[in-house]
């Protein structure tokens, strides 16, 4: 957006300040009641699922992600945390993908408990990020801060945030499913997780973002 403003309005004074997130790990353990309740209800287990978290809108490319996941050979689940209930888009996705025939695809509703959501992120095998419009997306920052392996849609603003810490996919048929198959054959993505957290620590902590706002307002003419 800032680039567009600079190109369209050369005399405008602009300052880009990103969104932020935190790196605090979940305090929950595998034995906690609410953890086990979720995982038992979802019929999944730690490291046994790919994860999507986000608003339930078409521009987040749920259709592509679900289609490609269904093409893949993984035995892991696809856990989708979103506000899908009573949504016409949900019914449309059912019709377009027939995902209800694939026992791996699981829409589980929303999770508003931050500590629990962090645990779910930290124990996902991988996070799939399909957001195609916007800027610094909060969901991507949270994924970089808490999930080792991130499979991210290849668009400029996603790449500008995740850099070399993620694997990228496009909407070409077979692209994401092949990436999932390849990822499923590896077992240690610790280095990618370290890179992702380093990016967040350097660029996207709330302390840094608040400091930038303070600097902006204190230095106003």
Where are the language model's segments positioned?
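Short hydrophobic beta-strand element within catalytic cores of glycosyltransferases
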Residues: 145-152
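A structural motif in glycosyltransferase catalytic domains
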Residues: 50, 65-66, 78, 143, ...
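Conserved acidic donor-binding segment of nucleotide-sugar-dependent glycosyltransferases
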Residues: 166-174, 181-187
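Donor nucleotide-sugar binding/catalytic pocket of nucleotide-sugar-dependent glycosyltransferases
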Residues: 1-38, 44-45, 106
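A charged, aromatic-enriched C-terminal amphipathic alpha-helix characteristic of glycosyltransferases
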Residues: 187-218
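Conserved donor-binding/catalytic core segment of Leloir-type glycosyltransferases
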Residues: 41-60, 66-73, 79
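Acidic donor-binding loop of glycosyltransferase active sites
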Residues: 119-135, 148
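Glycosyltransferase donor-sugar binding loop
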Residues: 21, 53, 77-91, 106-111
């Amino acid at each position: 957006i800032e680039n567009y403003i600079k190109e369209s309005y050369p005399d405008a004074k602009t300052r880009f300040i990103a969104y932020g997130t935190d790196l605090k790990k979940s305090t929950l353990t595998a034995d906690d009641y609410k953890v086990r309740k979720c995982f038992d209800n979802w019929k999944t287990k730690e490291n046994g699922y790919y994860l999507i978290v986000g608003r339930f809108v078409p521009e987040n490319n749920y259709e592509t992600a679900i289609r490609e996941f269904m093409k893949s050979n993984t035995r892991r689940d696809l856990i989708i945390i979103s506000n899908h209930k009573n949504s016409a888009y949900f019914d449309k996705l059912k019709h377009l993908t027939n995902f209800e025939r694939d026992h791996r695809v699981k829409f589980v509703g929303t999770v508003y408990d931050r500590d629990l959501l962090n645990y779910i992120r930290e124990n996902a095998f991988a996070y799939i990020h399909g957001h195609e419009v916007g800027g610094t997306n909060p969901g991507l920052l949270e994924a970089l801060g808490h999930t080792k392996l991130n499979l991210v849609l290849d668009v400029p603003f996603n790449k500008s945030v995740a850099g070399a810490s993620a694997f990228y996919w496009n909407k070409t048929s077979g692209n994401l499913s092949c990436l999932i198959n390849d990822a499923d054959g590896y077992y240690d993505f610790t280095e990618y997780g370290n890179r992702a957290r380093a990016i967040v620590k350097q660029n996207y902590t709330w302390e840094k973002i608040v400091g930038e706002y303070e600097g902006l307002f204190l230095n106003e003419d």
